[in-house]
């Protein structure tokens, strides 16, 4: 930690951000937006006392059971994901229900990406996110993940 003489603010160095913890979050029955905002706090490192905006201080997050996330109200029927294929008349629309059946990890990824900063640092922090369909996270046992209840 480096302490400046003229302020009381403590600034973390990039070398201090090397020890990264990993967390496992179960998305079963969780609301999409509330889950996403908690995950973004962990990815950016805002849950730490030594948070510094310009340093990648965040931890890694593994989200399991992505297909069991839900939305409140009528959004389940109204929410539409749009993408462009690159061709003329190539705008495609996929309803939430179809996207949940095909690519449940994309739903959470899309929500979290919208909350992250659109900078090089934000892209680097976003790479610490893993979203899994189902509840098996054995491939991440070597990181010794901590199970979080959000």
Curated annotation (Swiss-Prot):
Pfam families: Ribosomal_L13. One of its GO terms (biological process) is negative regulation of translation. GO terms for molecular function: mRNA binding; structural constituent of ribosome. Gene3D superfamilies: Ribosomal protein L13. Signal peptide: none annotated. Keywords: Ribonucleoprotein, Ribosomal protein. InterPro entries: Ribosomal_uL13, Ribosomal_uL13_bac-type, Ribosomal_uL13_sf. GO terms for cellular component: cytosolic large ribosomal subunit. Belongs to the universal ribosomal protein uL13 family. This protein is one of the early assembly proteins of the 50S ribosomal subunit, although it is not seen to bind rRNA by itself. It is important during the early stages of 50S assembly. NCBIfam families: rplM_bact. Part of the 50S ribosomal subunit. This is Large ribosomal subunit protein uL13. It comes from Chlamydia felis (strain Fe/C-56). The lineage of its organism: Bacteria, Pseudomonadati, Chlamydiota, Chlamydiia, Chlamydiales. The gene is rplM.
């Amino acid at each position: 930690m480096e302490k400046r003489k003229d302020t009381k603010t403590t600034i973390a160095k990039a070398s201090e951000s090397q020890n990264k913890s990993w967390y496992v979050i179960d998305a079963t029955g969780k609301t999409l937006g509330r889950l996403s905002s908690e995950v973004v706090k962990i990815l950016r490192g805002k849950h730490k006392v030594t948070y510094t905006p310009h340093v990648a201080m965040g931890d890694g997050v593994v989200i399991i059971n992505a297909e069991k996330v839900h939305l409140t109200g009528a959004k389940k029927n109204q929410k539409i994901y749009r993408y462009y294929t690159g061709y003329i008349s190539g705008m495609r629309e996929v309803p939430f229900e179809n996207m949940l059946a095909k690519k449940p990890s994309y739903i959470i990824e899309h929500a979290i990406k919208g909350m992250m900063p659109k900078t090089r640092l934000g892209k680097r922090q976003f790479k610490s996110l893993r979203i899994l369909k189902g509840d098996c996270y054995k491939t991440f046992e070597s990181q010794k993940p901590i199970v979080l209840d959000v």
